[in-house]
Amino acid sequence: MRRLAAELDTGAASLYVYFKDTDSLYSAVLDELLGSLSLVRGRKPWRERLVSLLTAYVDLLTAYPPLAKTALFTRPSGPSSVGLWEAMLALLSEGAIVGRDAAWAGDLLLQRATATAAEEGERRLGTNTVAADEQVTEVIEGLSPKRYPHLASLSNEMMSGTPTTRLIWSFEVFLNGITATRNKP
């Protein structure tokens, strides 16, 4: 709060008139940022629109790593957050995912999206991310096939794919599981 107050050329106490703590400030900023999301409408299939919405959410948060981390630990409840949830639930409803299944599916999908954004955001801030990736690749490729037969046989696949490709694949996996288990106790 002090750092922001200094940038705004005001005292930290003046910010507390509007926000009870840093978390509430970040939550408000996050909600404002979410307002810039385009809530996907159109004629494309519901799954495609849902994956597009979630991917746009990840892209938005990834551009602001501190807010992505904030989104992991806060439950924003501002109008833009509520609008995001409403859009998600409407899309799930189009896929006949309703009630508890929709509520839990939305939570699961947003958890995945938010965690991915926080991780990717941190990677973008990091100075040695390429070196770290190379180190992990080197370790995996150097594994003994006798001791680690599964990892060794999949060494090329373990680090394959772009972050976006892997993210979309994960959403599809979740949606396949969600649709397969809907309406079950």
State each model region's role.
Residues 94, 122-185:
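C-terminal peripheral helix-coil segments that are non-catalytic and often amphipathic
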Residues 86-125, 130-138:
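A contiguous pocket-lining binding segment that forms or flanks enzyme active sites
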Residues 38-83, 102, 106-109:
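Hydrophobic alpha-helical connector segments
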Residues 37, 65, 69, 117-124, ...:
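Short amphipathic alpha-helical interaction/hinge segments
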Residues 1-24:
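Helix-turn-helix
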Residues 20-24, 62, 76, 97-100:
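Residues in soluble alpha-helical coiled-coils and helical-bundle/repeat scaffolds
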